[in-house]
Amino acid sequence: MLDPSSSEEESDEGLEEESREVLVAPGVSQRAPPAAAREGRRDAPGRSGGGSGGGAARPVSPSPSVLSEGRNEPELQLDEEQERRIRLQLYVFVVRCIAYPFNAKQPTDMARRQQKLNKQQLQLLKERFQAFLNGETQIVADEAFCNAVRSYYEVFLKSDRVARMVQSGGCSANDFREVFKKNIEKRVRSLPEIDGLSKETVLSSWIAKYDAIYRGEEDLCKQPNRMTLSAVSELILSKEQLYEMFQQILGIKKLEHQLLYNACQLDNADEQAAQIRRELDGRLQLAEKMAKERRFPRFISKEMESMYIEELRASVNLLMANLESLPVSKGGPEFKLQKLKRSQNSAFLDLGDENEIQLSKSDVVLSFTLEIVIMEVQGLKSVAPNRIVYCTMEVEGGEKLQTDQAEASRPQWGTQGDFNTTHPRPVVKVKLFTESTGVLALEDKELGRVVLYPTSNSSKSAELHRMTVPKNSQDSDLKIKLAVRMDKPAHMKHSGYLYALGQKVWKRWKKRYFVLVQVSQYTFAMCSYREKKSEPQELMQLEGYTVDYTDPHPGLQGGQVFFNAVKEGDTVIFASDDEQDRILWVQAMYRATGQSYKPVPAVQSQKLNPKGGALHADAQLYADRFQKHGMDEFISASPCKLDHAFLFRILQRQTLDHRLNDSYSCLGWFSPGQVFVLDEYCARYGVRGCHRHLCYLTELMEHSENGAVIDPTLLHYSFAFCASHVHGNRPDGIGTVSVEEKERFEEIKDRLSSLLENQISHFRYCFPFGRPEGALKATLSLLERVLMKDIATPIPAEEVKKVVRKCLEKAALINYTRLTEYAKIEETMNQATPARKLEEVLHLAELCIEVLQQNEEHHAEGREAFAWWPDLLAEHAEKFWALFTVDMDTALEAQPQDSWDSFPLFQLLNNFLRNDTLLCNGKFHKHLQEIFVPLVVRYVDLMESAIAQSIHRGFEQETWQPVKNIANSLPNVALPKVPSLPLNLPQIPSFSTPPWMASLYESTNGSTTSEDLFWKLDALQMFVFDLHWPEQEFAHHLEQRLKLMASDMIEACVKRTRTAFELKLQKANKTTDLRIPASVCTMFNVLVDAKKQSTKLCALDGGQEQQYHSKIDDLIDNTVKEIIALLVSKFVSVLEGVLSKLSRYDEGTFFSSILSFTVKAAAKYVDVPKPGMDLADTYIMFVRQNQDILREKVNEEMYIEKLFDQWYSNSMKVICVWLADRLDLQLHIYQLKTLIKIVKKTYRDFRLQGVLEGTLNSKTYDTLHRRLTVEEATASVSEGGGLQGITMKDSDEEEEG
């Protein structure tokens, strides 16, 4: 509601000066109290108040220190006095709103604000968490929780952004808890699953431990103290608490409050309702005057002037309806006047309607409660002391009640009787009885009676009343002590005896009993009643009358002091016997008539006070004190003549200042009590909604610009209201838009747009760690609303995106600048060594990644609301990395040639970028690749050359000794070194084997050179793999090159091993003394390892998967076949040597004849060793020991089996061929014995070594077995001594040779 004197009115078109009361002295700027140190600065200098002082520009700052500069002392004192007067006047209006609200209520659905944290509490929290991390608390926790707390402590609690947020008052304990909860949710999700323990349980446990650390041990013992006013401000406040709050807000002293409280009669609801009626009547009159004189505020269209008057009338009518809807009494279903709810109240709601609602006598029927308490009877002498007496009581027209019985010697009761009546002047009868003792007596005997005529003004205390006794009674002085208490209904505003004379009613001057009845909030009636009557004898509605004190009227007998009620065409004269009674009647009727004129009794008449002198003296005392303190002008000031737009601006500002300095993290939201008072003030005093929200926006923006945390949702509400109003959407039903409102709205819109853009540019610092929750998302939403041209047309997303993109570009510069300042990177870049520069850039990269991860974690909330937000955040990150590029390139350019220390930087950055879908292969990522492609290629080239050289030199010096522990025997080959990061790079380990090396040597006894080769190839491939090169083509090229390199290197290794194997075997002898040397087994194992490693090192994923792998596989397989063949050939040559020796015993040879003769001759005298047994035994030992050597030292079972298969088969073939050459000859006994033993032992030994039955029992073996069996049979017949137990038959008793 825009008051005629509001700030929307231009000074040159305002109402005349005499129509308003002036609060501001001429030439003095309107200013707020000194407590509001920012008021003058916040008010727009162009604000024009439609009254005196309203158009004066306000000073830059009202603080005394600033004001005192260039101002003399009298001017300064005048300003301070003016501020005090403004505060007091405001407080008068505020306490009236609190005392009798009829428009607003304290909202109960507002979100409860959390207690804010201060710097001392933050420091205490840091100490508590540090104590936990140092193990100084009793809280038991696992390592994972400790790591989470350590991260929270280092990243969050120690952050300067958190310190600033706490200092601004926008941080609560709940914010700290939510940040910790968000951190641990991510950690717990990454933990492995544990049977029987859900992750929700872990989360709950961690939160409970966090709460225990947060509270601290000493806080558990503290008892809560009494809550202060600041602490209960979030609750629904009582009137006393609201008074106290606004005393603090407006700087009002207790004494000033008490004086105003008494003077305003804040505890008198009738006076407050009457004050409201007077205010509303004054506003209607002012609206009519404005319409008549055609003096309006400037509106954006001429048609709005008439609409403005209608809005003023409608707003007052609404307030009247609100007031009318309030019940007259607090309750009581017996009150029958509620039917006049004024559905037909057009008489007083609509201007110009002279029709009145005529009340009937039945409309003003009252209801009273009477309490009659009978205490005792005195002077009872006519009956015996032991007789029973009792009393009855009745209100005429109602039921009778009786007391208990008592003895005549002690007639005391203390009995109370409760009655209800509708008679304002009831008749109460109390009778005293004694029980009749006569047999025929039908009724008890009446001893006395008393008839009383109480009123609501009668004494409530017990009094003695003389009783009327029957004739001839001895009780001449019979008295009864009783109390009659008659209540005063809430709608009965005053009552008593008055003389009256009127033209239409009470046409005869006489004394009557009058009652002032309030039928509804706007309908009062003056009624005269007779005894025992419910309806008034006569009544007069007070609507339209004006009451005032008058001088005595000559000729009217009765009454000492006079007053009258005057209305056009009617005058009613009243008279009272008592001055104080007259004052009370005039005050009551003054409230009822709603007149603006306040009656003041004549000075001389105040001296006439035959009764109630003490009451008048008290009133005079209050008036004197009030006058002494200069309060009268504030009470008597007409609200409709003051600039409430200006006053409300000060009130709202002071309230917001107080709110932001209380103990709650309010973010700019008022407390329920403050909202209630501001709502009530605006409704009651006609503050336009747009003006209220424009002022609120100004204040909130001012605080936000000064570092306070303000909820953007709050800004959005007020801005949306103002935008809707300015564009004619009538959010509060007001269709008029003033020029000033539109201009101020445009100014605020531009200022708000700049503020929001600045906040988005500083989002890491305005919304640290995503606090307040949802604030960034709300800010983006508000910015979108602010950028709209009007309220109906949505702005294209591209335009919003363009603005936000510009903000995020600034944000990238701001964030990176602050990060480099924190890391002090510029000093390092200017002076440090290349290694130090690289170290600093690596640290800076870690900080950059941390910043962007925090952005994603805490500021990605716009993702749900704005589809373009992730893209812009990615562009922001690219800008951020572009700034980092300058420092990175500087550091890399300073590195010496062929220095690989920069690879960890690539791995760090690449691992972050490749996992971000929006940054992967982005501008910075590609720049990073362009820098490191030559380094990677150069590194691989040098590694290839170094490995090739190590193979060449290694095989030249190779001893082929098996390597048991690679860490102790690898040669120290000079290779390009890469510092280790979390990744394994191709370096020679210094006497400690990496964990992944275990598979290379646990079952491997390869050579030093081969093991070194395989380790280097694997490490190089792991290094390149761990680079996770993002560009597929180059990554495939690297992989292909490394696979080809591995294939070539392994091929060279295999060929060198094959050559060395052949040379080694050539040097070995062919006798049964041959034992396979360890070097041969090592060579064998090298081929085995090459086979295994080729699968991993030479296999490609993709179309060429088999290209290198199959080639090297074929080479290895063929080489293995060759060396098996060479080894078998060597073993067979030993067997051939044995058979060659046996050939000397062939039948018909000279040596055979001599040998047979000598053996036979010698056998007669000595125990001659069995010829041929030494030869068989040495061969069998040769086979067995070489089998054991191969089985022990060659690691591949498959190759061993192949070797044994071929060895067995070839051995059997050689023996079979040897026998085939002697088909026509009978074997010598020694030949036969030796062969049988060799064949049988060979068969059994190879069967034990796992040679399969099919191979063992081949055709060759069958042929051999049959031949030897036949030879054995022939020998047993021809030789007398036989074969001495040697036979081809299987036998367990057979001698083991």
UniProtKB/Swiss-Prot annotation:
Gene3D superfamilies: Pleckstrin-homology domain (PH domain)/Phosphotyrosine-binding domain (PTB). It is found in: Cytoplasmic vesicle membrane; Synapse; Cell projection, Cilium; Cytoplasm, Cytoskeleton, Cilium basal body. Its main location: membrane. The modification Phosphoserine is found at S61, S1291. InterPro entries: C2_dom (IPR000008), CAPS (IPR033227), MUN_dom (IPR010439), Munc13_1 (IPR014770), PH-like_dom_sf (IPR011993), PH_domain (IPR001849). Residues 1-78, 1275-1297 are annotated as: Disordered. Residues 296-404 form the DM10 domain. GO terms for cellular component: centrosome; ciliary basal body; cilium; cytoplasmic vesicle; cytoplasmic vesicle membrane; glutamatergic synapse; nucleoplasm; parallel fiber to Purkinje cell synapse. Residues 1-19 have a biased composition (Acidic residues). Residues 47-56 have a biased composition (Gly residues). Residues 886-1057 form the MHD1 domain. It is a peripheral membrane protein. Pfam families: C2_CAPS, MUN, PH. GO terms for biological process: cellular response to starvation; dense core granule exocytosis; hematopoietic stem cell homeostasis; positive regulation of exocytosis; protein transport; synaptic vesicle priming. One of its GO terms (molecular function) is lipid binding. Coiled coil: none annotated. Highly expressed in cerebellum. Also expressed in non-neuronal tissues such as lung, spleen, testis, uterus and ovary. Highly expressed in brain. In brain, it is highly expressed in cerebellum, cortex, olfactory bulb, CA1/CA2 regions of the hippocampus, and dentate gyrus, and weakly or not expressed in the CA3 regions of the hippocampus, striatum, thalamus, superior and inferior colliculi, and brain stem. Not present in adult adrenal glands. Isoform 4, but not isoform 3, is highly expressed in postnatal and adult stages of cerebellum. Residues 353-468 form the C2 domain. Keywords: Calcium, Cell projection, Cytoplasm, Cytoplasmic vesicle, Cytoskeleton, Exocytosis, Lipid-binding, Membrane, Metal-binding, Phosphoprotein, Protein transport, Synapse, Transport. Residues 491-594 form the PH domain. Residues 756-1075 are annotated as: Interaction with DRD2. Calcium-binding protein involved in exocytosis of vesicles filled with neurotransmitters and neuropeptides. Probably acts upstream of fusion in the biogenesis or maintenance of mature secretory vesicles. Regulates neurotrophin release from granule cells leading to regulate cell differentiation and survival during cerebellar development. May specifically mediate the Ca(2+)-dependent exocytosis of large dense-core vesicles (DCVs) and other dense-core vesicles. The PH domain is essential for regulated exocytosis and binds phospholipids. Homodimer. Interacts with the dopamine receptor DRD2. This is Calcium-dependent secretion activator 2. It comes from Mus musculus (Mouse). The gene is Cadps2.
